[in-house]
Amino acid sequence: MRTKIAMMIAMVVLVALVGGGTALAQTIGGVIQCQSFPCVATGDHQVLFERVGDGVRDRLIAQAGHDHLNARTYTNDRDVAKGSGGHDLLMVNDGDAMDGAIGGPGNDTCIVDAAIEAADTCETVVYR
């Protein structure tokens, strides 16, 4: 009987660890679909996507790590992508030229629609 109880406890712990690892990966690394304003990375190498919908302004903020901030899917809005430590990729080329890409202390690349969207803190600027 004790062996069965010990096996059940071990299975519960194993399931909790496996399931918890997936939830942890969604918040501390990998891809984040933003749901809030502002949307802030957690400090790992991450890809942040702007909130869903045209006309929805976003503020994506990188943390330490080499982050990719993607605010180029939806248009007719004023998005801001702000880099932090690390080599960040800030993409605000959504076709409306109303956005802002602000590099941080790392070596950041800003992809924009027009020169006015790129701050002088972007080490590399690409126009698309």
Question: Model regions: which residues?
Answer:
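Bacterial N-terminal signal peptides
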Residues: 8-18
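Short Cys/His-rich zinc-binding micro-motifs
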Residues: 100-101
